[in-house]
Amino acid sequence: MATFVQHIVALVAVALLSMGGRAMAQEYPNPFVVEQGNESLVRTEWGVGVGGVYTGFGSISSDAVTLNSRLAFQGHLDMAVVVGRYFAVESGVIYERGGIDAEYRGKRYDITTTRFEMPLLLSLRLWDSMVRLKGGVQLGLASSGGYLDGKENYMFGTVTPTWNLAAGVGVSVMPNMVVELRYIHALQDGVNQLGATVKGAGLDFTTRTHKVMLGVSLLM
């Protein structure tokens, strides 16, 4: 959790520096912004959005466990440094909340998942940014799952690992609105557990996930 807080503090610091640079640019020339005609060669872009996420399990180390994801809700804050007309570096913070229907030894479990993630993507923008092709990594800052069995709460474990590959395409449907489809593939296994009781631990197993995200962002 401490690492996640550090990432958030760093992101806020970048935002404040960026806004401060904009305010200074209104009165003094900014040596870090190259003007090309009336358009800045380097500029920042901000956005907020929502979307849906489906998580698939490519592999499960135990045949005794069955996992089926439910559609998750996503909210995100987006930030990009745009260089010229065609290139950008994109980042942000993503919050996801969803669920998994699990079964182990004939018993069903309703697992609730919560995730915080940070994408780091390179973006190629075509046709005046109407189409945005992007790829890079998506970092899992914090990921947890848990379930209630009787009156006891138990931890399911990590759903999204730290390192994930990401690729996507965004389309501008309005001047300030972008719809994006993104695929995320985990590079690490998640460590999970089911069937724990007050008397002892349950079955330990690993999973490898992939995700499909569809979202809409409003640019500011």
Describe the role of every protein-language-model region.
Residues 21-80, 133, 140-146, 151, ...:
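Short glycine/proline- and aromatic-enriched beta-strand/turn motifs that initiate or cap beta-hairpins
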Residues 52-58, 95-99, 126-128, 139-143, ...:
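Transmembrane beta-strands of outer-membrane beta-barrel pores
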Residues 58-64, 101-107, 145-152, 191-198:
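Outer-membrane beta-barrel translocator domains and adjoining extracellular loop/strand segments
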Residues 154-155, 160-220:
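Predominantly the C-terminal beta-signal and adjacent terminal strand-loop region
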